[in-house]
């Protein structure tokens, strides 16, 4: 590990609900000695920095301040949460044109600063914006990671934990594919305490229809939260903290993320949700899950959906 040193610096671009939740999670964990907040609304970044620094006596010493894109020059990690929020009744893919425009104004000044660290992207539609960040930046694919299905997989583990009366962190299960409506639960590889989930479900009389209902509830949970409180932010903010921790502490942790496909699952030239090894160099390698035939079809269909929207979105951006 050559880039990550004892003094670690993170720059957050986008200080909305997700960004500020991520910043608070990072402050709580004491991860990174220097944390910079960048947003077009300068007063908010100053206010958040002042508010967050008041948490440091209870957590760990940290220099938190409002900054500019030039502060990215010596950063280890740049986290992008900036973008138009998802509104009630709106899908993540509906956001593509608005947020591709916003992203195009972010990546260039970050790169122009001399930044050579790792990008972590969370703005929606995250798989498409992660791919666009990779394209706009010219960075190696390993140094651009999406939050992908990290939050969705957490939601699945919460739901399965409730169903089978175990702690969510004892459930080894992944949502895969798009972070969005074409995502799916990879039940064939899921387990609890090394025992296959499908075997446990059969023994406990949990039907395939019930498992499908759990999958649907996970897929639609964001819409439920958005309809009730306007946005989701605590879960994704914590998921971003976990990925950041794996990078900054060089953990070689297997996490659900949005990763570039280079032949895995028969896919190429796309970012999509899968387990992967994350360390100080970024995305070390994809863990290609042994999906069932039905799940493999869902993965392919999800990629097809993403590629069409990605192609149309980038074309529209070029025509502007």
Curated annotation (Swiss-Prot):
Keywords: Cytoplasm, NAD, Oxidoreductase, Phosphoprotein. GO terms for biological process: glycolytic process; lactate metabolic process. The modification Phosphotyrosine is found at residue 223. Disulfide bonds: none annotated. GO terms for cellular component: cytoplasm. GO terms for molecular function: L-lactate dehydrogenase activity. The active site is at residue 179. It is an enzyme of class 1 (oxidoreductase). It is found in: Cytoplasm. This is L-lactate dehydrogenase. It comes from Pediococcus pentosaceus (strain ATCC 25745 / CCUG 21536 / LMG 10740 / 183-1w). The gene is ldh.
């Amino acid at each position: 590990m050559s880039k990550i040193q004892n003094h670690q610096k993170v720059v957050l671009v986008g200080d909305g609900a997700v960004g500020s939740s991520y910043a608070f999670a990072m402050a709580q964990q004491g991860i990174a000695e220097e944390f910079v907040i960048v947003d077009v609304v300068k007063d908010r970044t100053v206010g958040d920095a002042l508010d967050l620094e008041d948490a440091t006596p209870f957590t760990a010493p940290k220099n938190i301040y409002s900054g500019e894109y030039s502060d990215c020059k010596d950063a280890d990690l740049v986290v992008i949460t900036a973008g138009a929020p998802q509104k009630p009744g709106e899908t993540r893919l509906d956001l593509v044109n608005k947020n591709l425009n916003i992203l195009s104004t972010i990546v260039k000044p970050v790169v122009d600063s001399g930044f050579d660290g790792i990008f972590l992207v969370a703005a929606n539609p995250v798989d498409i914006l992660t791919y666009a960040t990779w394209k706009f930046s010219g960075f190696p694919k390993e140094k651009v990671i999406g939050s992908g299905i990290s939050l969705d997989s957490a939601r699945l583990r919460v739901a399965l934990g409730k169903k089978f009366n175990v702690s969510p962190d004892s459930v080894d299960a992944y949502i895969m594919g798009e972070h969005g409506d074409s995502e799916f639960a990879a039940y064939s590889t899921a387990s609890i305490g090394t025992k296959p989930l499908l075997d446990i479900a059969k023994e406990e009389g949990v039907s395939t229809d019930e498992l499908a209902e759990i999958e649907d509830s996970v897929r639609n949970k964001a819409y439920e939260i958005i309809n009730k409180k306007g946005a989701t932010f605590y879960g994704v903010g914590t998921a971003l903290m976990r990925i950041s921790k794996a990078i900054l502490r060089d953990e070689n942790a297997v996490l659900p993320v949005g990763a570039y496909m280079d032949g895995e699952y028969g896919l190429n030239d796309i970012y999509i949700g899968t387990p992967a090894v994350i360390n100080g160099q970024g995305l070390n390698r994809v863990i290609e899950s042994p999906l069932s035939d039905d799940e493999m079809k869902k993965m392919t269909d999800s990629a097809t959906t993403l590629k069409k929207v990605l192609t149309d979105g980038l074309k529209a951006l070029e025509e502007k």
